[in-house]
UniProtKB/Swiss-Prot annotation:
PANTHER family: TRNA THREONYLCARBAMOYLADENOSINE BIOSYNTHESIS PROTEIN TSAE (PTHR33540:SF2)
Record InterPro entries: P-loop_NTPase, T6A_TsaE
Pfam families: TsaE (PF02367)
Alphabetical GO biological process terms: tRNA threonylcarbamoyladenosine modification
Function: Required for the formation of a threonylcarbamoyl group on adenosine at position 37 (t(6)A37) in tRNAs that read codons beginning with adenine. Is involved in the transfer of the threonylcarbamoyl moiety of threonylcarbamoyl-AMP (TC-AMP) to the N6 group of A37, together with TsaD and TsaB. TsaE seems to play an indirect role in the t(6)A biosynthesis pathway, possibly in regulating the core enzymatic function of TsaD.
Chief localisation class: cytoplasm
Gene Ontology cellular-component annotations: cytoplasm
Binding locations of ATP: 54-59
Designated name of the protein: tRNA threonylcarbamoyladenosine biosynthesis protein TsaE
Compartment list: Cytoplasm
Family that this chain belongs to: Belongs to the TsaE family.
Gene from which this protein is expressed: tsaE
Residue positions binding Mg(2+): 58, 132
Amino acid sequence: MSREGIRRRPKARAGLTGGGTATLPRVEDTLTLGSRLGEQLCAGDVVVLSGPLGAGKTVLAKGIAMAMDVEGPITSPTFVLARMHRPRRPGTPAMVHVDVYRLLDHNSADLLSELDSLDLDTDLEDAVVVVEWGEGLAERLSQRHLDVRLERVSHSDTRIATWSWGRS
């Protein structure tokens, strides 16, 4: 059951439907990309962030949260697995920020069980779910999801981001 009053936009999104690539030389550029992506998200969307340690996944999640105007500091939820960030404005979705990094040593059945125990699917109608390290798993939460891959350029602070909409 969804909360009344949450605005839902049509699933077609101008500018993001085909995906894209961006070079991000500064942290501010990663925040800006996150904000740009965040402006296009609506309740029910799942965003899967992947890339090596230090690639900028949490920074991108901060940018998404800035655009969504949700409460609380956005920090990596590695040790608590998931954090709910409530919307500051009525009629806008919450953001659930998930990080499954510490579960990666588990076998895939255990990992799916842990992910399932978070009951994220119950939040999908009223929230945008952003999952760090969820590649190959989080996509199962929604038929339509945004995949964002961040890579670090060797011997540089520059990151390369690639994103596309996927279907499960």
